[in-house]
């Protein structure tokens, strides 16, 4: 196995192991997690097919950074992730705890990130592998945590199910758009206005830290039965405590 392939997949494997360990209650079946990973591969293939079809009919979104960020990445990628996720896990009987939505979503997103990483690193080399391991793959992980969080809210909360379902798409799309916009805009202006590009990159780094903070709060501070807020160290709210 080549070094580049190992570097491409190492952050994906590391984050998959991390989220699997964080599932401290009822571990999800490995077969279902494999389906989620393969679903992410399916998302990557679908995105490639979609944009190849658009190019064939003369439609291009590679015009300005915000259009490329939204229409070329955030919207199609996160929407397809959501649709594949619903298809694979929504009616599955193993989807029975709040944290499950986060586990499924992250595995699917990491499947996508793995394919994307291999393609980028194959063309860009070790420098790209290191950069994407620090930023791009964790970003897909963060988007997935937020998507899984709202997906579980839609499944387990008794009210506002459609609203939480909408948020499961809208919030990851927004976060993904902002992430790509700061990065693409800074690259676009790097030779035109270096000081502006530097400020954008600084904003990008701060946004990356914010994503991590948002994701970790979603992972640690929700009841496993219904998704209600709980105190640190607890696993269930008073309404969902298992019978002794």
Question: Where are the regions that the model predicts?
Answer:
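Hydrophobic alpha-helical segments at protein termini of multi-pass membrane proteins
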Residues: 1-244
């Amino acid at each position: 196995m080549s070094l580049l392939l190992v570097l491409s997949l190492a952050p994906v494997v590391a984050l998959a192991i991390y989220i699997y360990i964080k599932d401290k209650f009822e571990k999800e079946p490995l077969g279902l997690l494999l389906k989620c990973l393969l679903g992410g591969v399916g998302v990557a293939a679908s995105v490639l097919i979609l944009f190849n079809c658009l190019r064939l009919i003369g439609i291009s979104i590679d015009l300005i950074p915000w259009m490329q960020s939204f229409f070329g990445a955030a919207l199609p990628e996160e929407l397809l992730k959501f649709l594949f996720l619903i298809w694979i896990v929504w009616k599955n009987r193993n989807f029975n705890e709040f944290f499950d939505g986060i586990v499924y979503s992250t595995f699917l997103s990491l499947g996508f990130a793995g394919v994307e990483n291999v393609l980028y690193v194959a063309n860009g080399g070790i420098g790209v592998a290191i950069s994407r391991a620090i930023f791009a793959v964790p970003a897909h992980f963060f988007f997935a945590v937020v998507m899984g969080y709202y997906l579980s809210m839609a499944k387990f909360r008794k009210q506002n199910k459609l609203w939480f379902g909408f948020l499961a798409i809208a919030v990851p799309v927004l976060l993904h758009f902002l992430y790509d916009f700061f990065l693409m805009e800074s690259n676009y202006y790097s030779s035109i206005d270096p000081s502006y590009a530097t400020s954008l990159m600084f904003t990008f780094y701060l946004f990356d830290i914010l994503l991590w903070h948002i994701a970790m709060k979603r992972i640690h501070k929700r009841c496993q039965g219904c998704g209600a807020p709980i105190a640190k160290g607890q696993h269930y709210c008073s309404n969902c405590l298992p019978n002794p």
